[in-house]
């Protein structure tokens, strides 16, 4: 069955793994995905009566023996908590890093991109719901250890390992181990996340990451609660923590007609970003296309994305972008001082790069990012 990569959703050598697109019955699960190792989780505490409390994400699930947390990929076995998705990869591809999107991070390079099943929120507009909203036994996967990932990433010519497609927070231990090993072999790691994570595990993970992309899905609690089964405040806490630890990060907002597309919301969000994160954080306003549980709304009008970008510029943010509109001038990076184009893009391709020693070649204005 076709997945997000066209003919298949995971190709590794002569191995082919496709996403599950049907709801499996318990009977149909028998014999699927057997033999994957489990690993004890890193962030939880033991309670009475063999219960545990997960301390990874803001949900702080309390889990009885032989039950799982909200994410569906972490299980209590006899009073100890285990991840079921360590090295259990269900989606894999080599992408341009611009696809993440990361525009101020090693432009023009490749990212070895992988995912396991599971997520800790349920966004009604999720484009990768076939893996994010399924349990690991419902999605065909292959065993790919951190050692395998590092080896294959280097063979592919990738500079970076990207944890993406589903939600990396729920495969935290796998990401942690792989990023740690990758660093030893000269590979950077980036987390493409919803930002729904507690501060302690985030700080520990940041020691092994080079960059993070956070989806700021809206700037209202109402949207998060009704459309994502989550909360806004923990995501804002994640962003401020990333700022405090000195992590390079970029923000993406998927703009959905009638749900999070008001000028008022854009102004409030951009004002908060400037005040709490600074003017140099890139923000990508990306175009929505109908999918999953929101198929009744049209694609985002380009003029709405342009309005959002103009609001960001008016607020004083230096690097707002228009996303999912290939060829739009809002894909380019402009020098905030002289206003000339520093990097010209078309989709995921770099057409021109006028950086010189990480500065605008025309006026020597430093352009923040990780460029080498």
What are these regions (language model features)?
Residues 81-164, 169, 175-176:
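Extended interfacial segments that mediate partner engagement and assembly in macromolecular machines
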Residues 1-2, 119:
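Twin-arginine (Tat) signal peptide motif
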Residues 103-104, 203, 352:
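Short secondary-structure boundary/capping segments
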Residues 143-301, 308:
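Conserved AdoMet/S-adenosylmethionine-binding subsite of the radical SAM
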Residues 3-13, 23-50, 54-62, 259, ...:
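Auxiliary Fe-S-binding modules of radical SAM enzymes
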Residues 16-18:
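Cleavable N-terminal signal peptides
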Residues 28-53, 59-115, 130, 341-343:
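N-terminal [4Fe-4S]-dependent radical SAM core
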Residues 66-73, 82-85, 135-139, 347-353, ...:
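Short cysteine/histidine-rich zinc-coordinating motifs and their immediately flanking basic loops
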């Amino acid at each position: 069955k076709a997945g997000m990569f066209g003919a298949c959703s995971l190709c590794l050598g002569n191995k082919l793994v496709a996403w599950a697109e049907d709801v499996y019955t318990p009977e149909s699960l028998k014999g699927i995905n057997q033999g994957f190792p489990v690993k004890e989780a890193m962030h939880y505490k033991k309670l009475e009566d063999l219960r545990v409390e997960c301390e990874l994400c803001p949900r702080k699930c309390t889990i009885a023996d032989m039950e799982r947390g909200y994410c569906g990929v972490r299980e209590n076995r006899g009073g100890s908590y285990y991840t079921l998705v360590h090295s259990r990869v269900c989606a894999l591809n080599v992408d341009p890093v611009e696809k993440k999107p990361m525009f101020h991070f090693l432009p023009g390079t490749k990212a070895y991109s992988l995912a396991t099943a599971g997520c800790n929120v349920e966004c009604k507009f999720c484009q990768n719901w076939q893996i994010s909203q399924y349990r690991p036994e419902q999605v065909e996967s292959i065993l790919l250890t951190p050692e395998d990932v590092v080896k294959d990433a280097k063979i592919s010519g990738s500079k970076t390992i990207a944890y993406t497609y589903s939600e990396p927070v729920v495969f935290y231990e796998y990401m942690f181990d792989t990023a740690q090993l990758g660093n030893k072999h000269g590979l950077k790691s980036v987390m493409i996340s919803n930002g729904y994570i507690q501060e302690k595990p985030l700080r520990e993970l940041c020691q092994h990451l080079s960059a993070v992309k956070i989806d700021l899905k809206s700037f209202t609690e109402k949207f998060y609660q009704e459309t994502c089964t989550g909360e806004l405040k923990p995501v804002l806490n994640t962003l401020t923590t990333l700022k405090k630890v000195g992590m390079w990060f970029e923000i993406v907002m998927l703009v959905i007609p009638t749900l999070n597309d008001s000028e008022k919301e854009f102004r409030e969000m951009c004002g908060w970003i400037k005040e709490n994160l600074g003017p140099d954080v890139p923000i990508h306003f990306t175009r929505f296309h109908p999918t999953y549980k929101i198929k009744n709304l049209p694609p985002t009008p380009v003029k709405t994305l342009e309005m959002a970008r103009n609001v960001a510029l008016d607020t004083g943010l230096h690097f707002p972008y228009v996303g999912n509109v290939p060829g739009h001038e809002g894909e380019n990076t402009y020098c905030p001082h002289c206003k000339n184009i520093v990097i010209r893009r078309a989709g995921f391709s770099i057409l021109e790069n006028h950086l010189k020693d990480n500065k605008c070649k025309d006026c020597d204005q430093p352009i923040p990012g990780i460029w080498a």
